[in-house]
Amino acid sequence: MSTTQFSSESRGQYKAEAYAAAGAKSPLAPTTIPRRDPGEYDVQIEILFCGICHSDLHQVRNEWSSGGVPTVYPCVPGHEIVGRVTKVGSAVTRFKPGDIAAVGCLVDSDGNCHECQAGLEQFCPHMTLTYNSPDMHLGGVTYGGYSDSIVVKEHFVLHVPPNLNLAEAAPLLCAGITTYSPMRHWSVTKGKKVGVVGLGGLGHMAVKFAHALGAHVVVFTTSPNKKEDALRLGADEVVISRNTDQMSKHVGSFDFILDAVSAEHDINAYIQLLRRDGNIILVGAPEKPHAVSALGLLFKRRNLSGSLIGGIAETQEMLDFCGKHNITADVEVIPIQRVNEAYERLSNADVKYRFSIDMASLKSQ
């Protein structure tokens, strides 16, 4: 990986069509944004599909400002990007025009810190997010995938297996890697007992990955009507988490639990389900901090951890794994003109299980 040379110097640019929010209470609306002309190490991509992540909703509504991540407007969201390469820089070696390519949550990092050298660019202190992050090339902030095109350094561009449906592949760039990475890090393999808390955008991907890895998969949900879908996605068992009898049958038996719930809930009930040295991993982020009983961790040396997306090499590994096992997200494809309706439905958990925007609709305005 070449070291990034951060620069805010003026360079050639072009105008791209996009949808942006002008403020926290403003609907997303058509606009034009600047994109840099492809440089020596850059790949220009015509965006074909972009998934809608719940973090897009939080960011657009400035709901993370209290956590130190204020939104800069106009905000163009989108970090689940799949498209077709249109131009490449002279030093680009892994892509050519016409290739199908993808971009996830990161578009840059410093390239030489300990985290980058370990392939963990998501933890780089100077990493650049795909949107609402300082743009070291044009100034201002980065703009995401609710747009007709994007220009990204080659290192952060990914190959998409040819057998995957592109609309369904887009959410893999966030929901996919967010759930795949902790399973790989904590060695989810055949024979392990794995719990998935919550069957939403993240949870449904976690079920698919855990099943493909050969684990015995148990889904925890508050909704009995999700049982049939959980089994269809690959779960071996479904537990209604409000049913204390069902929960008590699993005490001390799990190797690994992935908690994908962002709503407030009692995490101690799930900690008790771990065996000795078992791991519960948080990928959901409730607004209020969890109240954790130390004794639940101490007496069986249980571990509570968090996980944030994944590095670039691991994200490519995840996409290749999806190609091998024919794994994609369950999506509802929408035109960009329905994005505000999709946001309202997402806030009411009214989607199975991700929205994917057909960006061809942007051209029909």
Predicted segments, located by residue:
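Glycine-rich beta-strand-centered segment in the early N-terminal region that forms part
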Residues: 34-50, 64-117, 122, 161-164
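Helix-to-beta-strand junctions that scaffold the AdoMet/dcAdoMet cofactor pocket
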Residues: 274-276
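Adenosine-nucleotide cofactor-binding segment
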Residues: 190-199, 209-269
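NAD(P)H dinucleotide-binding glycine-rich loop of Rossmann-like/cofactor-binding domains
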Residues: 109-197
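N-terminal Rossmann-fold NAD(P) dinucleotide-binding loop
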Residues: 203-204
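Short glycine-centered segments of the SAM/dcSAM-binding site in methyltransferase folds
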Residues: 100, 193, 278-279, 303
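C-terminal hydrophobic helical "lid"/dimerization subdomain
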Residues: 2-14, 312-365
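Rossmann-fold NAD(P)-binding glycine/threonine-rich loop
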Residues: 284-301, 312-320
